Amino acid sequence: MSTIRSIHAREILDSRGNPTLEAEVTLEDGSFGRAAVPSGASTGTKEAVELRDGDKTRYLGKGVRKAVDNVNTTIANALKGVEASDQEGLDRRLIDLDGTENKGRLGANALLGVSMAAAHAAAASSKQALWQYLAAKTGVTPSLPVPMMNIINGGAHADNNVDFQEFMVLPVGFTSFSEALRAGTEIFHSLKSVLKGHGLSTAVGDEGGFAPDFRSNVEALDTILEAIGKAGYTAGEDVLLGLDVASSEFFENGKYNLVGENKRLTSEQFVDFLADWAAQYPIITIEDGLAENDWAGWKLLTDRIGKKVQLVGDDLFVTNPKIFQEGIDSGTANAILIKVNQIGTLSETLEAIAMADRAGYAAVVSHRSGETEDTTIADISVATTATQIKTGSLCRSDRVAKYNQLLRIEEALGAGARYAGRDAFVSLKR
């Protein structure tokens, strides 16, 4: 039987050395599932609540003992005997048990850990890999996503003078995920060499990308183009560029305060700034180009470049179906970033991806800056209509773990493996 026998949670460490929650679910047939919950640095104000202890004498207040205790008592007691394979029913019980709009009573970290661990256990009970199990539920033919590789870190992810949070390469001109991964890796190592040649730091940020000081934000783009060429690839053909502007982080008093550029721009001026970059560089995707509450600015940007550039809402939508529907109805952005801990259960995550597909929006499955060795998001990216995955750079085991899982999945799919490549940008009318 795939009913739940027991649930257990513990406090572990994430990639930033902060506590996070790990949950384990054991079924009556002996099947077992484990999942660890990620944590973000730049967070949307409307995200589901990550429950922290607030005890400054322990882990600087970032402990998660309260969330762990909620799993080991309230949640474990309520879900004992529940069918693990009924993911929607299980998640509905979790949501009702919490009873708040933002999952703040028990903690989204408590709910998500159990939700994902239950899926792992149910997959094990059905003798399937998680991606196979989820694909059977979604009815989607598995495919390998395009990786959005964050090779230069700035903003909240690094201690440097770069305003924008992520500068990414997307290896689209390849026929397999493994070849795309190889290209990205070679560009990463080429970039290290280029940075050294310019006398710049090769220390890495939270997500494994390099975090040097540049004279301007655009210098980061120019340096990446140099690295792509040095690695033997062609920007605009083999490899496209992406940005996570994370503009909510520097939106102050109605202006975009670019310290690295010594500029304070209105929404209209910042849209011009981004549109100019998109015209000058092979940029295919821009995430959080405008601040999360600047819906008028977002609409301006969408109308300006939304037919040529994928515009991804992260802080804007926070993987929340209700907020996402507002974006769909108003024609704001054309893609959504999917972060499991922004919404707090697996079912709601899958529904957000399905919503995107129905609306003609692209879906990008994403890690958080505080990660673990958990690879659940890799399986989700394969088993749904999401066409891209964002899981950091080509170093740090917490990032590489997801890439390695995708390599295993591609191998398991064999001749049936399909890599999204240039078809990944489903929302663009080219």
Swiss-Prot record:
Where does the source fall among the domains of life? Bacteria
Pathway of this protein? Carbohydrate degradation; glycolysis; pyruvate from D-glyceraldehyde 3-phosphate: step 4/5
Annotated Mg(2+) binding sites: D244, E287, D314
Which BP terms in the Gene Ontology apply to this protein? glycolytic process
What is the E.C. number? 4.2.1.11
Record keywords, A-Z: Cytoplasm, Glycolysis, Lyase, Magnesium, Metal-binding, Secreted
Query: Which SUPFAM superfamilies would you find in this protein's record?
Result: Enolase C-terminal domain-like, Enolase N-terminal domain-like
Task: Give the active-site positions.
Answer: E207, K339
Q: Tell me what reaction this enzyme catalyses.
A: (2R)-2-phosphoglycerate = phosphoenolpyruvate + H2O
Matching Gene3D superfamilies: Enolase-like C-terminal domain, Enolase-like, N-terminal domain
Kindly give the InterPro entries that the UniProt entry links to this protein.
Enolase, Enolase-like_C_sf, Enolase-like_N, Enolase_C, Enolase_CS, Enolase_N
Q: Does the keyword section mention Magnesium?
A: yes
The main place the protein resides is: cytoplasm
Q: How is the cofactor bound?
A: Binds a second Mg(2+) ion via substrate during catalysis.
Q: Matching CDD domains, A to Z? A: enolase
Q: Does the keyword Lyase apply?
A: yes
Positions contributing to (2R)-2-phosphoglycerate binding = Q165, K339, R368, S369, K390
What broad class of enzyme is this? lyase
Q: Which family does it belong to?
A: Belongs to the enolase family.
**Self-association and partners:** Component of the RNA degradosome, a multiprotein complex involved in RNA processing and mRNA degradation.
Q: Outline what the protein does.
A: Catalyzes the reversible conversion of 2-phosphoglycerate (2-PG) into phosphoenolpyruvate (PEP). It is essential for the degradation of carbohydrates via glycolysis.
Official protein name in the record? Enolase
Source species, please? Stenotrophomonas maltophilia (strain R551-3)
